Amino acid sequence: MQELRLVLILVGALAIAALLFHGLWTSRKETSSKFGKKVDIDFDSDVDDEQAAPMRGFDQPKEDVVVQKERKEPAFAREEVPTSDDPLFEGTVSSESNKFTEQEKPTVQQAQPQPVVQQVQEPAVGRIEPEAKPVAAPVKREEPTISFSAIDDEVLTQPEPIQAKVDIPETSTYLEPEIIIAEPEPEPEQDVIVINVHGMGSDRFSGNRLFNSLEQNGLVFGDMAIYHRHSDLSGAGKVLFSVANMVSPGHFQVPEGEEFSTPGISFFLPLPCYGDAEHNFKLMLQTAQMVSSELGGNVLDEKRDMLTPNKIDEYKQRVKVFCRK
């Protein structure tokens, strides 16, 4: 195995060496064919027909390569002279053309260029790349650079246009808060339960006797010159029901005493009332019956008819319905 490996290594090395040699040889051959051509320096045959520029050939040197550049001067072309049958005209033209040729020859010989010799060192490795042709560098036009930050600053710093302020009366687009006027709550429906006490026939209730009966049943003379039943028997509490004179204006003339008389009195319970309405109605009915019994009178309804049990039930029902509202 080791011998086979050595053989392969040697074969590979030889192949690599052959490739390198072939590459060097090919590059030298290309270089010789490129720089070994003859450069002809030819001058215009019209200027000097007899003299011709020598043709020089340069062999490929081993190290330095001489490149002969051709510099071509402008040639003066000979104008063709129109021929004519007139002999005088031919002589003039030929003489002028000869003078021009004689003056032209020394000028062209003085302007004969010298060959320019340029040494080109052969690169050490590989092929020789062709000489780069001079390329005219593009002319750079310096354009003004625009700084966007400066523009932004300029825009920001530009003074705002002055606008004339005109006070325009504002329209009533502002919705003023609605003023909620608390409407007065509707007064609760009021009702009055009336019970009358009337004397027998044409009898009348005398003043002192009537006043004593009312006071003994818990009634107190007070506002509006009438009697009231209070929640407190001392007369300091709320009014539960009241008693008025049946004769208008309804006042009692207590100071007159015996001189005062009336055909009857009226008990009335206003609804709503303080406390329990049903209890207040029962208390008013009992008081009316007690006073009627003491004075010898009759208990009547609001229409001054006899108070019957059915009418009492109707009063109670009215009180219950009102309390439910």
Curated annotation (Swiss-Prot):
SMART domains per UniProt: ZipA_C
Biological process according to GO: division septum assembly; FtsZ-dependent cytokinesis
Record bears the keyword Cell inner membrane: yes
TM spans (from-to): 6-26
Keywords assigned by UniProt, alphabetized: Cell cycle, Cell division, Cell inner membrane, Cell membrane, Membrane, Transmembrane, Transmembrane helix
Membrane-side (Cytoplasmic) residue stretches: 27-325
PANTHER family noted in UniProt: CELL DIVISION PROTEIN ZIPA
Record text on subunit structure and interactions: Interacts with FtsZ via their C-terminal domains.
Protein name per the record: Cell division protein ZipA
Organism (species): Aliivibrio fischeri (strain MJ11)
Species lineage: Bacteria, Pseudomonadati, Pseudomonadota, Gammaproteobacteria, Vibrionales
